[in-house]
Amino acid sequence: GAIDRILALRPDLVISAGDMVAGQRLPHLGTVEVDAMWRAFHAHVSNPLRAAGIPLAVTPGNHDASAYRGFEAERQIYGEQWRQRRPDLEFVDDAGYPYNYAFSHGKVLFVSLDVTTTGALPEAQKQWLARVLAEHGPRYRHRVIFSHVPLWPFTQGREDDFSGDPELEKLLQDAGVGLYLSGHHQAFYPGSKDHVHFVSLACLGAGPRLLIGDGQRSERSIALIEIDGPDLRFAAL
């Protein structure tokens, strides 16, 4: 399975782009049901990674921490789950963990954005990101952003399901962000625009999607990101 492959690769860290459990349902799920899904996720994913000494950095998705009205309880449970499982990372700004936060590894600055809804990023979070990138970004060779909902669309059926925030895009460009990882569109695609790599991550569960303009469904996969000196390499495995 995917976890066995990850354990065999021995990566420096693992990033999850959200939707680790299947919440955001109507009628709303109860706490018992949501907790049971988290227990299963930890048993199959979190615990094996922790036992192997591989940190897991998470970002909220709409199915595990939706910011849409009515899912406040699921969002709170997400926070409780990951505050109890805080990874062994060098945090640069952890006030918003496990939603929006920043950490470093080697010469790379990683920033999680809390993006579980479509439309522009809230102004307060944009200001926070600008401050983190201005204060800490210049110390690192690479700056990597990750969130659930992408900045731009990748797949069929989700053409309108993205943030599309031009102010955020300009902020990334001005701060020299080299890589933006996202989930939600359930297909692997390594693209780039104006010196920023935008990599959409495939899913491991249900619902692989067709890329826009493509007739072939994306396979389930994990993405291997290799950062070697000035170079960034991406592959779906």
Question: What is each stretch, according to the model?
Answer:
Residues 1-35, 124:
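N-terminal active-site segment of His-dependent metallophosphoesterases
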Residues 12, 143, 178:
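Conserved acidic residues
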Residues 18-19, 61-62, 148, 183-184:
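Active-site glycine-centered loops adjacent to acidic/histidine catalytic or metal-binding residues
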Residues 26-141, 167-173, 179, 191-228:
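Extended active-site neighborhood of metal-dependent phosphoesterases/phosphodiesterases
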Residues 136-155:
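Short acidic, glycine-rich surface-loop motifs adjacent to enzyme active sites
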Residues 145-151, 180-188:
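Histidine-centered catalytic micro-motifs
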Residues 154-164:
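Outer-membrane beta-barrel translocator/channel fold
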